[in-house]
Amino acid sequence: MPPPLQAHRLLISHRRLPSPARRRFTAASSLQSAPATTLAPGPATSSILSIRESLLSGERTAADITSEYLSRLRRTEPSLRSFIHVADAAAEREAEELDRRIASGEKDAVGPLAGVLVGVKDNLCTANMPSTGGSRILDGYRPAYDATAVRRLQEAGAIVVGKTNLDEFGMGSTTEGSAFQVTTNPWDDSRVPGGSSGGSASAVSARQCVVSLGSDTGGSVRQPASFCGVVGLKPTYGRVSRFGLMAYASSLDVVGCFGSSVFDTATILSVVAGHDKMDSTSSSQVVPDYASELVSLDLLESKPLAGLRIGIIQETLGEGVANGVISSIKGAASHLEQLGSVVEEVSLPSFSLGLPAYYILASSEASSNLSRYDGIRYGRQFSADDLNELYGESRANGLGHEVKMRILMGTYALSAGYYDAYYKRAQQVRTLVKESFKDALERYDILISPAAPSAAYKIGEKINDPLAMYAGDILTVNVNLAGLPALVVPCGFVEGGPAGLPVGLQLIGSPFCEGNLLRVGHIFEQTLQNLSFVPPLLAES
């Protein structure tokens, strides 16, 4: 039973310290809507909740539900290419076993995620299917264990339907960097889904699965969520175990999740979050039941966000951000004001320094982490006459261009002659970024910004211009540097494609305050009466 509204308000801390670097936000913009589709718009509904209710009532079987999703996956996968590996036969067997247990009256059969089909980004280990990291060097690799996040989903009753595509080892923003295939965007198959978790975002957007897992090192959950019109959550660093996640940059990597609604995303977080003895960086803080704290639309008052203070980051609405994106974000801010919150502009002076610092730090950590891929212990091995040649051949043939480039960049930054000039200075910038966010979040309950400078762009548009691609991460990397939680919810559209292109609103909170973000995101989502984030691909099929 959701808590009453007053309890909901009390769950959000309100700090009102004076700030010289703020001004009242004003916006006349309305939320940007997309051209009409054949599916009726309305508040996002929970697929997880409806699946659970239908199983408990006997209205549907797990086999029926699985068949529905697999049918849609088979229909759309040739054009989307969201999955590197599909475990359809295994999913059908698990669904049949669940039905058998329900029929036999086993009380624990219908777990919180019973019958829910989940896609898993292919840099998370799965013992019963290949785990490649999107790289040729791990082609055919089958781990001996499941990642903790995957195991917890399965223990809650979820059915893993397959491994989703990604930029190789998470290094990219378009999913064009995969060694196996290019994933497309369900809103327009000539456009990228974002990255590096593009396969996970595309799969949820196209309803190939109910929810999915991704990873976020510098925006790899949030930017694809914005591009594909789904909800994406990057938890606080340490909130979810990284055990079984192929390491890219260990001080930045976070396991995140995607859903078609905030409720679904909150439900997944409640399952996967929590301390894990296999990950020394995982937090021992108590994990709330995030979904139970969400208030349904019919229980909301006219001003459900009254008393909430929101800061809109000035630096995210300037040069380099598309006008249509700015209009959508301003429209979303105006909507939040109509719900009762106070929205003011706030400046984060160190914001622009985050991007170069991030790429130095991430590449430096990657140069160490990826040294484990040597062609000996696991993965693909290339023939050679001696050990050094084996290392060279395996890495030269097994790793892609972007990965090699970042390894070289990181090795350079860590070298004796340049450590102080690059790596040490980047760490100092990271401290400034953390302090900047800390100061802002002492004055505001939540900060907001766009999740990406533009909507989804054409496949091939930026793949040969790495600087332009890196610049696209400027709105997300600071959150990783600071280790903060952030939620992306669809908030509007810009022109493009057959039915417009979605834009995501990024909500940023204090450490371990995911509950605040989810409550505000849920209220925002539920009150968008005239927007539907169902891609035309589904309306046609």
UniProtKB/Swiss-Prot annotation:
Return the EC number. 6.3.5.7
Q: Which family does it belong to?
A: Belongs to the amidase family. GatA subfamily.
Entry-linked Gene3D superfamilies:
Amidase signature (AS) domain
Pfam families cross-referenced by the UniProt entry: Amidase (PF01425)
Q: In the UniProt record, which is one GO cellular component term?
A: glutamyl-tRNA(Gln) amidotransferase complex
In which broad location class does this protein mainly occur, judging by the first location in its UniProt entry? mitochondrion
Instruction: Look up the further comments and give them.
Output: This protein may be expected to contain an N-terminal transit peptide but none has been predicted.
Which is an annotated GO molecular function term of this record? hydrolase activity, acting on carbon-nitrogen (but not peptide) bonds, in linear amides
Q: Which SUPFAM superfamilies match?
A: Amidase signature (AS) enzymes (SSF75304)
Q: Which organism is it from?
A: Sorghum bicolor (Sorghum)
Q: What residues form the catalytic site here?
A: 121 (charge relay system), 196 (charge relay system), 220 (acyl-ester intermediate)
The job of this chain, per UniProt, is described as: Allows the formation of correctly charged Gln-tRNA(Gln) through the transamidation of misacylated Glu-tRNA(Gln) in chloroplasts and mitochondria. The reaction takes place in the presence of glutamine and ATP through an activated gamma-phospho-Glu-tRNA(Gln).
Q: Keyword check for rRNA-binding, yes or no.
A: no
Any one of the GO BP annotations: mitochondrial translation
What catalytic reaction does the record list? Answer: L-glutamyl-tRNA(Gln) + L-glutamine + ATP + H2O = L-glutaminyl-tRNA(Gln) + L-glutamate + ADP + phosphate + H(+)
Which top EC class is named for this enzyme in its record?
A: ligase
Write out the annotated subcellular location: Mitochondrion; Plastid, Chloroplast stroma
Complex and partners: Subunit of the heterotrimeric GatCAB amidotransferase (AdT) complex, composed of A, B and C subunits.
Checking InterPro entries in the record gives: Amidase, Amidase_CS, Amidase_dom, AS_sf, GatA
TM helices/strands, residue ranges: none
Output the superkingdom of the source species.
Eukaryota
Q: What is this protein called?
A: Glutamyl-tRNA(Gln) amidotransferase subunit A, chloroplastic/mitochondrial
* Keywords of this entry: ATP-binding, Chloroplast, Ligase, Mitochondrion, Nucleotide-binding, Plastid, Protein biosynthesis
